[in-house]
């Protein structure tokens, strides 16, 4: 945690960490002035979601909190300084909710997730995986409403997430020759929903996420957007093989990175541009080490502080195929 460090210094440290990791693992030497930095104006209480571990005490009470440094003990909390106020308001009352009563009856209580939606301001709690019957969340980003499956991934810092979506749209709109975008690991289509005037195909293994993405596209009048469910690497090999070179490939994988399957697909038919968004500079560096030798050069880099008071951050790099 970085809570003991002045916030401006936190951002400086993270930007330096980004450059150092990309150089050490990815072999890409980056000057300090090359990295665009996006800070968070909300330094505390920015998270719209938290997950709390559960533990049954000797008095048969179920308590919620975070795992301590010893990786065994549970530290009971009344509030989280990084969470939205509506999220914190529900923490003391977890055992009073409908799911809380059910959780208390389990031999081993499940961890609790509390989410606050920006659209209808509703705060909900569930235990373990999101129940099948739980309604889709409605979130507002950049003045547009999105639906997302209740248990799906979404960024926890709305302000910086909006900045990330705008940045991706601005980058792709600046690529005048680009007419087609593949949004790999697209989830509910968050990043590519900011795109206009280009054709978009999104690829995602989660069928519920794809259902939400297609709904969002239709709801926002994006008739040139289509989202497909299936194995991303297999779909990527099929799609890249049919497309003109003037294609931008958005990569927004989980923390584990894209892996060899995606790298192999890119090596078979390299798109003109790759816009890689990452929450782990280590796996980004690992993947860059494989992608850069395919003929790519970096054109833009950014570090977005999605997670103030922690060592984590979001990063972005635009690569362009060098045909010289």
PLM features per residue range, with description:
Residues 1-251, 256-262:
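Accessory RNA-recognition modules of RNA-modification enzymes
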Residues 58, 120, 189, 282, ...:
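Surface-exposed, flexible loop/turn segments at secondary-structure boundaries
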Residues 68, 303, 321:
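Active-site donor-binding loop signature of nucleotide-sugar glycosyltransferases
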Residues 310-324:
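Core SAM-dependent methyltransferase catalytic element
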Residues 228-313:
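S-adenosylmethionine
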């Amino acid at each position: 945690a970085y809570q003991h460090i002045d916030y401006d210094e936190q951002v400086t440290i993270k930007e330096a960490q980004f450059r150092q990791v990309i150089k050490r693992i990815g072999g890409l030497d980056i000057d300090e002035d090359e990295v665009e930095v996006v800070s968070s104006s909300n330094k505390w209480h920015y998270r719209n979601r938290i997950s709390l571990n559960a533990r049954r005490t000797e008095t048969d009470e179920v308590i919620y909190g975070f795992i301590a440094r010893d990786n065994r003990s549970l530290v009971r909390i009344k509030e989280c300084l990084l969470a939205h106020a509506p999220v914190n308001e529900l923490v003391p009352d977890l055992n009073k909710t409908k799911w809380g009563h059910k959780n208390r009856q389990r031999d081993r209580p499940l961890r609790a997730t509390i989410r606050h939606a920006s659209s209808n301001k509703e705060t909900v709690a569930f235990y373990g995986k999101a129940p099948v019957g739980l309604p889709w969340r409605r979130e507002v980003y950049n003045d547009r409403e999105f639906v997302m499956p209740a248990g799906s991934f979404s960024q926890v810092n709305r302000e910086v997430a909006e900045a990330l979506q705008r940045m991706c749209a601005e980058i792709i709109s600046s690529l005048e020759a680009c007419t087609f975008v593949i949004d790999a690991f697209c989830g509910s289509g968050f990043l590519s929903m900011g795109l206009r005037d280009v054709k978009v195909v999104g690829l995602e293994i989660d069928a519920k996420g794809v259902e939400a993405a297609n709904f969002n596209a239709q709801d926002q009048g994006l008739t040139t957007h289509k989202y497909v469910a299936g194995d991303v690497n297999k779909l990527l090999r099929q799609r890249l093989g049919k497309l003109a070179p003037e294609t931008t490939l958005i990569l927004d994988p989980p923390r584990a990175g894209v892996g060899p399957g995606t790298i192999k697909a890119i090596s078979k038919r390299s798109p003109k541009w790759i816009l890689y968004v990452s929450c782990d500079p280590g796996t980004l560096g690992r993947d860059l080490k494989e992608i850069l030798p395919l003929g790519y050069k970096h054109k833009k880099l950014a570090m977005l502080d999605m997670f103030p008071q922690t060592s984590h951050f979001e990063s972005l790099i635009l690569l362009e195929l060098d045909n010289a």
